[in-house]
Structures are given as structure tokens and as C-alpha cells.
């Protein structure tokens, strides 16, 4: 099978707040909010800080799909190159990867990025809001001790995952059943996470139609909200001192087919 990729474009303000409004598949980038449900922070770029709130599902602006369409993808293909696209003074800068330029900066806050999926129970995602125990993790990439040490020592800018890293490849599990799914991307910024409610979560949900899956996976499902506790050690952590030597992202381990 020929590998194909989806790029989740991240737009960031100088404040390091950001949104995930578009994806790219087979080299073609969608318009903002074309296949991603518009989020509450589409103008403010602000985070979710209450993990018990309904915003944890898809951080959606309004009920319904806000006119978002479906993107057809193949199970086993790569959802690849999670890349950075910065917004400056509200205008898209020329270093956006989905404009064909490489990102020349990195997000300033360390923390894990998680990808989850949820299958629309009725077969159609149009009226699906992502509520209930329907979610499973397909990937997580988190900061290492060296990332935290770099941040602690100099308070300098560090990447989400590791210094210099601006891309992330994620595979749609081959063992999924065919159908319509949410792909939920979530970055957890930990720079202020030393107390409950300090972690900042940036969330979006794209709508995918998956085909070519084997249908053999029977996942253990979770809900958003519900999967995370405000006191989860993956959400309440002082990354500066003492520097964490081990960090585990909330939500458990990702799916392995």
C-alpha cells in the first residue's frame, strides 16, 4: 500500500497559544475548518484548563459539525508531519508549512501531544458530538528528561517533543473497522502545570472516513471529559525543579494492532 499522509497544521501566536484548523492528505491541504470542527478558541487561541469540562471533547464552538466535511483516508496510512505554522499579529506568516515553507521556529512550551480517535456509533459523524466512552488513543509523543532540563536550565524556547523537532508522523491503525471517525489532536503545555488547573490543553477534532481496515481491533474506550483527572500526574508536574526524570502522558498507552 502506498503511504499517504495527513498534516495537522498548528497556528501559533507569539504568546504560544494556538489552534489546529486544517489537515493535509496526499499533499493537499484543506481550508481552515473545512474538515476540522471549528473550535471555541478559533479567534482567541486560548487553551482548555478544566479537564472536567465539556470542552475536553473537541473544544467545539457550537453543537453540530459547523459545516465541516469528511476527509477520506486509508487505514494503515500515515497521518504524518504534524507541523508548526505560526500566526503573527493575526496574519498567517510565510513560514507556514502548508504554504510550502518550512517552520523556522518552535513552540515555546514543552508537553506531550496525543492523538485519539472515536468512531461514530451510528455510522454517520454528522450528528455525532463525541460524548460517551467512544475514544481510544492511537499515538502519544511526550517530552523527555533532557527537554525538561533544557527548559529548566535556561527557560529558553524548547520544542513540544524534543529540541529541533517540528514534525510528527502518526499512523491510522490498520486494524480499525471502516467507518466515520473523529481524529482528536491534543497538545498539553506543561510550563505552568505545577498546580491543579495549570496545564494548558489545545484540542481539535478532524472528521475522517476510514476505509481498508481489518476491523479486528476491539478497543478499551474512554470518554472526554472523564479520561483525565485534575490531579493526574501527567497534568500536575513541576518541570523546572526538581527536573522530572520520568513523565507519562495522561490517557494511557496508545493502540497497538
PLM feature spans:
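Peripheral, solvent-exposed domain-edge segments
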Residues: 2-113, 117-167, 190-257
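A short tyrosine-centered beta-strand micro-motif
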Residues: 181-185
Amino acid at each position: 500500500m502506498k503511504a499517504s499522509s495527513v498534516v495537522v497544521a498548528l497556528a501559533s501566536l507569539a504568546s504560544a497559544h494556538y489552534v489546529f484548523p486544517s489537515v493535509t492528505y496526499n499533499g493537499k491541504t484543506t481550508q481552515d475548518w473545512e474538515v476540522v470542527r471549528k473550535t471555541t478558541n478559533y479567534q482567541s487561541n486560548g487553551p482548555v484548563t478544566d479537564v472536567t469540562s465539556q470542552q475536553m471533547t473537541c473544544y467545539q464552538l457550537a453543537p453540530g459539525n459547523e459545516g465541516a466535511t469528511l476527509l477520506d483516508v486509508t487505514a494503515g496510512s500515515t497521518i504524518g508531519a504534524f507541523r508548526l505554522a505560526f500566526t503573527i499579529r493575526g496574519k498567517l506568516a510565510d513560514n507556514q508549512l502548508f504554504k510550502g515553507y518550512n517552520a523556522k521556529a518552535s513552540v515555546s512550551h514543552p508537553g506531550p501531544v496525543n492523538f485519539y480517535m472515536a468512531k461514530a456509533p451510528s455510522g454517520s459523524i454528522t450528528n455525532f458530538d463525541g460524548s460517551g466512552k467512544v475514544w481510544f488513543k492511537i499515538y502519544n509523543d511526550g517530552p523527555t528528561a533532557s527537554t525538561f532540563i533544557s527548559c529548566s536550565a535556561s527557560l529558553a524556547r524548547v520544542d513540544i517533543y524534543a529540541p529541533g523537532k517540528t514534525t510528527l508522523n502518526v499512523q491510522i491503525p490498520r486494524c480499525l473497522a471502516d467507518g466515520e471517525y473523529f481524529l482528536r489532536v491534543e497538545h498539553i503545555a506543561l510550563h505552568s502545570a505545577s498546580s491543579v488547573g495549570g496545564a494548558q490543553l489545545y484540542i481539535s477534532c478532524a472528521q475522517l472516513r476510514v476505509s481498508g481496515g481489518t476491523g479486528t481491533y476491539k478497543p478499551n474506550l474512554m470518554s472526554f471529559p472523564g479520561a483525565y483527572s485534575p490531579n493526574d500526574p501527567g497534568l500536575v508536574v513541576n518541570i523546572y525543579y526538581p527536573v522530572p526524570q520520568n513523565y507519562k502522558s495522561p490517557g494511557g498507552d496508545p493502540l497497538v494492532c
